[in-house]
A protein has these predicted regions:
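N-terminal [4Fe-4S]-dependent radical SAM core
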Residues: 1-7, 270, 275-279
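Conserved alpha-helical substructure of the radical SAM core
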Residues: 1-80, 86-90
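Hydrophobic faces of well-ordered beta-strands that scaffold small-molecule active sites
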Residues: 4-8, 50, 77-79, 102-104, ...
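Aromatic/hydrophobic pocket-lining residues that form the small-molecule binding cavity
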Residues: 31, 35, 63, 92, ...
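Acidic (Asp/Glu)-rich catalytic clusters
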Residues: 41-43, 93-98, 164-167
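Active-site beta-loop-alpha junctions enriched in small/polar residues
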Residues: 55-57, 82-84, 107-109, 149-151, ...
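Distinct, well-ordered alpha-helical segments
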Residues: 64-66, 88-95, 155-164
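Radical SAM enzyme [4Fe-4S]-AdoMet core and its adjacent flexible, acidic
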Residues: 112-126, 133-277
Length: 279
């Protein structure tokens, strides 16, 4: 049994250096046609949505081709992005044409705090606000999610964030900082407890009780076996106990790969931002 959603990491390239990032670095990329052939095959087996992620997915030279191809296959597409593509008219046009949902990061109501947690792009906070302002003037029905990683640095600077946005998101999702891959040093100094995260989430839900935005939380271990990642090298992975675990490769025997996925991924609980709660 396959999940309804696959997170396709088009590239591991990124133009930011976020200290909490758990993205992997993949140097070897297989032929794009092989990746698309696999996605076309699983589309016929029930997978119906793709989250395009990375790295920063819009940095891939194949980004436009991937969008067009997956859209033609009948996939519903979401984009998890840092927003840096917005100044490229051609990429922006493709995103607005093909993507149903955009997830953008905001780490604080305070621009200085946000920019300290999202280094690499000058005035990133201001850039996100500009994107939201531009989206508010379009007549396109694009669903919006704002994501925030809660740390010791920003936990006290989140109240009122929704009030400063020019466009009200459908979902504001807060993530408890989790350790994975290369962010262990940051995790050790910035991690907040389950109790602190729960209280933060509750307080924000109360503060913004009259908002139409749904405020939800993702706890540190919520991710276990609830994602299926497709890497640019053709590997399929999931997360177990905050570590990425190899399931197999798209070149593996179909029966073997399906069995591995059904064993290692909780296909009924795969996280997708296409559900009503964008979880």
């Amino acid at each position: 049994m396959l999940p309804s959603t696959i997170d396709f990491r088009i590239t591991s390239k990124c133009n930011m250096q976020c200290p909490f990032c758990f993205g992997t670095k993949v140097s070897h990329h297989i032929n794009l046609s092989s990746l698309l052939a696999f996605l076309e095959k699983v589309r016929k087996k029930g997978v119906d949505s793709i989250v395009l992620t990375g790295g920063e997915p819009t940095l891939s030279s194949d980004f436009g081709t991937v969008l067009n191809s997956l859209y033609d296959m009948g996939y519903t597409l979401a984009l998890s992005t840092n927003g840096s593509f917005w100044n490229s008219p051609s990429i922006r046009e493709d995103v607005l044409r093909y993507v149903s949902c955009i997830s953008l990061p905001l780490e604080s109501v305070d621009s200085a705090v946000h920019n300290s947690l999202r280094p690499g792009i000058p005035k990133h906070y201001e850039m996100i606000q500009k994107i939201l302002q531009d989206l508010s003037t379009t007549k396109l029905n694009i669903r919006l999610k704002i994501s925030t990683v809660v740390t010791k640095t920003n936990i006290g600077t989140l109240s009122g964030l929704l009030n400063k946005l020019p466009l009200e998101p459908e979902i504001w999702k807060l993530y408890q900082l989790s350790v994975c891959n290369s962010n262990e040093k940051f995790y050790n100094t910035q991690h907040i407890s389950d109790k602190q995260f729960r209280e933060c989430l509750y307080q924000l839900q109360q503060t913004h009780a009259t908002s139409a935005t749904r405020i939800v939380g993702g706890y540190e271990f919520d991710r276990d076996r609830k994602y299926l990642f497709l890497e640019p090298n053709g590997e399929l992975k999931t997360i177990v106990h905050n570590q990425e675990v190899l399931i197999g490769h798209i070149s593996d025997n179909d029966e073997y790969l399906s069995r591995r996925i059904s064993i290692m991924v909780d296909t009924k609980q795969v996280k997708t931002i296409f559900r009503t709660s964008f979880t």
